[in-house]
Amino acid sequence: MPNNKPNLLFVFADQLRASSVGYAGEEAVRTPNLDAFARTGTIYKNAVSMLPVCGPFRGSLITGRTPTSTGLVINDIPLRTDEISIGHCFKDAGYDTAYIGKWHLDGPNRPAPVPPGPRRQGFDYWMGANFEHNYDRSQFTDNAGHLQMWEGWDAQAQTSHTIEYLK
């Protein structure tokens, strides 16, 4: 029986204001792929972050809960492994799940690997970095739990890995 479930892709960007993209009228920044998403997807024109700091906001995106509910009120607090994440929900619905890119939900262990298991919050496939601001050949943890280096500019390497995973 064929699998008719659509692929779902969530893009979490650091430091991205709603006004800093081409489809919002920003001429100095070229964002053709985001502009294409905007033409065919949904644009939320009135969105508010409960806590616009990396870790707490990522925790909200992953769990659907507020930072005060998850306890992630500042950076470098680990997301509790008993939290229900989108990784768990999609996995329970029969999806293969993957997380590729910056995680920042495993506490202050910035360069340390995020090992396979509950700290990956239900994601089956993993190529993530708990925290990194190097952006060029920075470290990440591979699916087996080993530290690796992205090849070249992180965003491009992560995008390439995501495309390969989706194929």
Region locations from a protein language model:
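Formylglycine-dependent sulfatase
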Residues: 1-167
